[in-house]
Design a protein with these regions (language model features):
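Short, contiguous, pocket-lining structural segments
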Residues: 5, 20, 43-46, 50, ...
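Acidic/histidine-rich catalytic neighborhood of metal-dependent amide-processing enzymes
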Residues: 6-8, 34-127, 161
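Structural recognition of the beta-strand scaffold that forms the well-ordered cores
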Residues: 13-15, 25-29, 68-71, 100-106, ...
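Solvent-exposed, polar/charged alpha-helical surfaces in well-ordered, non-transmembrane soluble domains
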Residues: 49-52, 56, 88, 134, ...
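Short, electropositive alpha-helical surface patch
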Residues: 80-89, 159-169, 228-239
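Active-site-adjacent substrate-binding region
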Residues: 107-227
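Acidic, Ser/Thr-rich low-complexity intrinsically disordered segments
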Residues: 217-269
Length: 269
């Protein structure tokens, strides 16, 4: 618990201890507050449910590295990116501990409003360490979701990964982006895709387990992830765009920039 600007806030944190306390822990986190008094099924109850599910699974496995699970308060306006924001306060309180990697979830319960890409999950932040790109390549998402890794700068600091980015902690940010019910009273449970939520939970468990054993040697944002991004655009996006009668050619960073702008237009970004 903490106080800020005369208000009380509460982060909820648990840890599965590892065998080697000298190793920096990994962090799995999501905010649990909602915008205004809206239901917040997608924003952000779905992510909270995934964190709790993965925590239950990881609690039964012995590993060298500790795993911290954090549910953050005060992510939504008017606290967003302020000193009241739960993830910022959490990092400030724990900065001497250090973190091997942070995995942050937000808006992970809905289908993308793009025909043929409803099952897509964006994974941002692999550019922060070469080892994260290797983990993404080595951990298939499974048959129920498709993953599209991309740069964080295309969406900006829209969630709790912000404090880890500015402090040069390797991170991955998992999200399905915004949709028509974002920050609306219509963000209700019956609109969620529970099969997709379950698939994202399995994927998070896989990449968290892999990252816990992966050396992340840096430097922070010290490599070019263009080739990985192109591989996923070619395998995931090309077939769908061709079926829509809108074939595209994406071959370099300039093309990826164009593609990202196009996708943000589809998603209302």
């Amino acid at each position: 618990s903490y106080e800020s600007a005369g208000e009380s806030y509460h982060n909820i944190v648990a840890m599965v201890p590892g065998r080697d306390p000298s190793l920096e822990p990994i962090l799995l986190g999501a905010h649990y507050d909602t915008c205004d008094s809206f239901p917040g099924a997608d924003d952000n109850a779905a992510a909270v449910a995934i964190i709790l599910d993965v925590a239950a699974e990881m609690a039964h496995v012995s590993r060298d590295r500790s795993v911290v699970f954090a549910l953050f308060d005060a992510e939504e306006p008017p606290n967003f990116l302020s000193q009241s924001m739960g993830s910022i306060r959490f990092y400030q309180d724990q900065r001497l501990t250090g973190f091997h990697c942070a995995l942050i979830l937000d808006l992970v319960g809905h289908d993308l409003p793009v025909p043929g890409l409803e099952d897509l999950l964006f994974v941002m932040g692999m550019e922060t360490d070469y080892g994260l790109g290797e983990v993404i390549k080595d951990c298939p998402a499974g048959p129920s979701i498709r993953v599209l890794p991309t740069l964080s700068r295309y969406v900006g600091d829209m969630s709790d990964h912000h404090v880890f980015r500015v402090n040069h902690v390797p991170y991955l940010f998992l999200s399905c982006g915004t949709w028509e019910h974002y920050h609306q009273p219509t963000d209700t449970p019956e609109k969620l895709n529970y099969g997709k939520i379950e698939a994202i939970s399995r994927y998070l468990l896989a990449i968290a387990s892999a990252i816990s054993m992966k050396q992340l040697s840096g430097p922070f944002e010290g490599y070019d992830s263009t080739d990985i991004e192109l591989d996923y655009i070619h395998s995931v996006i090309y077939p769908v765009m061709a079926q829509m009668g809108r074939p595209i050619r994406v071959n370099d960073r300039r093309d990826i920039d164009w593609f990202a702008d196009m996708m943000m237009g589809y998603l209302g970004g």
